[in-house]
Structures are given as structure tokens and as C-alpha cells.
């Protein structure tokens, strides 16, 4: 008999090859580091499942994972699993909260939608403190143009134009519920997008295309044409990885209610 554990983790994606293990073996992934730490805590081999895979250099504030262990965990006896796990993790990875999850919970398959955020420093000079955590654009950006083009992202559409080449999936249709640009503070803007799911590098490709249209002075409605084309070559280049954050993963309320906090 096994116990299923759900937990959230934040990480600085700098220096990692992404969430998933990669070849050659000398590349270090976020999942690999967490699995090794969990194996030390539970004294058994742990296999980790996450809500999704982030690329090299991409960060997360609330990545959701689950694993199963042969250790029996009593939810009535408070055990700070996150404290135990963090003692085996580097400072760039932090376990935030943990629960005993029901058998039908799955970090990947149970997720209903996700929110990502992209940060851009828009100043004449780059930021020494944000260079690993945001893109830098020197020339002034017309945020109204970006916001206007983002309206064409909303709804249930085929986003094949924003799928990176070489990553085939059976279905490229996704539903976008929210897509907004705003100033986070003077000189720093953010793009927040919530959807039912995202294709590989989809958010970075959307941001890169939005900036491309704005810089070239093309009408924001061009975004609609690019989506309709279902052709990656019609879209702009991807924005750099370091500006992207996985902010939140959503699950059915029923599943959330049946998770017992540790």
C-alpha cells in the first residue's frame, strides 16, 4: 500500500536544463534534484509527476507535483515534510506546501488550467538584478498595442502557430481565458495569461510575436491572421526563457477539498 503526496514547489530555473531529465546525463534538471532529495527523506526511490514541464531557464512560483511512497503518513500527526525536503534542496528550489492526496489525484492529468506570467524590463539600460528573471527591451514599448493584440488570443482556438517545431501533440487546440499586459512598476511590464493548457514554448512564442508586431508597427489584428494560419513560420521569434514564470496550477475543487494538508 502506498501514500500519494501532493506538494507545491518554487524554483529559479537558471542553471537547470528544465524540469525534465535530459541527455547528456551531465545536465541537471529540477525534477532530478527534487527526486534525489525525496529519496533521501523517504529512504526509497521516488518518481515525481508534475503539472507540466518548464523549459531551461524558466521559473516557477507554484509548480504542483505528486509522488507515491511506501511510508505510511498519519495526517493527524503534523509532519513538516517541506522542512525535511528543503534541508536536502539547494536554495534555488523550495518546497512550499504539502498534502496527502486522494488516489485519483494526478498532478498532470487532473490540472484544469494554468497561469503564466512574463516579465520585461523596458528601460534604456538593463537591470543588473533582474537579468536572470526578466527579458530586457531597450526601446520604449507601446503597451496599448500589446494589449490590443492580446484580445485575439482569447477563446477556444488552434494555437499551432505558437507550437515549437519538433514537438508534435495530438491536439493543438487550447482555450485562453485571460491575456493581459500591464505595468508592474515604472519600467517593468508583465504579461499574464491563463488557459486550459499550453503547447511547448507557446507563451514565449506569443510574447515574442506580440513584441514583433509592436516593433514593426503592424496592426494588432495581425495576431488573428497568425493564429488562423496555423503555421509557426508566420509567427515571431520566441521571447527569452528567463522572463517566464509558472504562477499557478488549478484543479477541481472536489480534489482540492480531499487533499489533507501536512
Curated annotation (Swiss-Prot):
CDD domains: PseudoU_synth_EcTruA (cd02570). InterPro entries: PsdUridine_synth_cat_dom_sf, PsdUridine_synth_TruA, PsdUridine_synth_TruA_a/b_dom, PsdUridine_synth_TruA_C, TruA/RsuA/RluB/E/F_N. The keyword Thylakoid does not apply. The active site is at residue 55. Pfam families: PseudoU_synth_1. Its EC number is 5.4.99.12. Formation of pseudouridine at positions 38, 39 and 40 in the anticodon stem and loop of transfer RNAs. This is tRNA pseudouridine synthase A. It comes from Bdellovibrio bacteriovorus (strain ATCC 15356 / DSM 50701 / NCIMB 9529 / HD100). The lineage of its organism: Bacteria, Pseudomonadati, Bdellovibrionota, Bdellovibrionia, Bdellovibrionales. The gene is truA.
